[in-house]
Amino acid sequence: MPLLDSFKVDHTKMPAPAVRLAKTMTTPKGDEIAVFDLRFCRPNQEILSEKGIHTLEHLFAGFMREHLNGEGIEIIDISPMGCRTGFYMSLIGVPKNARVLEAWRRSMEDILTLKSEEEIPELNIYQCGTACMHSLKEAQEIARTVLDRGISIMDNEALKLQL
């Protein structure tokens, strides 16, 4: 089985919160696709709470689209990592890391402005597979931690595993 790109980086060296351009590819029609690693916490040292990451999944995708889409960039998907240390974001176009960082920072600020769980999009049994597993408080704690620590940009060369 081929080794996936995400397993070719040394997770012990990953800073967090941090942005990493994980992969780029070109479709047969010539569209550029980018995948970003948005690492919220240090692998094997911290983990995002299940309610917090689930609520972030509902909020983060919308706020990131508000702040990042445009000028040849369109988010395809933002999904939580199985290890619960961050999210992968797939896009049409390849924005600069600094632009992604700024959109992420602004999204965390947006999350802190919410007053109640009624403001969480698609939080109902018809649109969410586990509607009872949410916590705005935990999502806001994660957002506050990201802002307090500051977001950096990862260096792919420094993270490359010597296989």
UniProtKB/Swiss-Prot annotation:
Fe cation binds at H54, H58, C128. Gene3D superfamilies: S-ribosylhomocysteinase (LuxS). Binds 1 Fe cation per subunit. It comes from the Bacteria. Its EC number is 4.4.1.21. Keywords: Autoinducer synthesis, Iron, Lyase, Metal-binding, Quorum sensing. One of its GO terms (molecular function) is iron ion binding. Pfam families: LuxS (PF02664). Signal peptide: none annotated. Involved in the synthesis of autoinducer 2 (AI-2) which is secreted by bacteria and is used to communicate both the cell density and the metabolic potential of the environment. The regulation of gene expression in response to changes in cell density is called quorum sensing. Catalyzes the transformation of S-ribosylhomocysteine (RHC) to homocysteine (HC) and 4,5-dihydroxy-2,3-pentadione (DPD). This is S-ribosylhomocysteine lyase. It comes from Wolinella succinogenes (strain ATCC 29543 / DSM 1740 / CCUG 13145 / JCM 31913 / LMG 7466 / NCTC 11488 / FDC 602W). The lineage of its organism: Bacteria, Pseudomonadati, Campylobacterota, Epsilonproteobacteria, Campylobacterales.
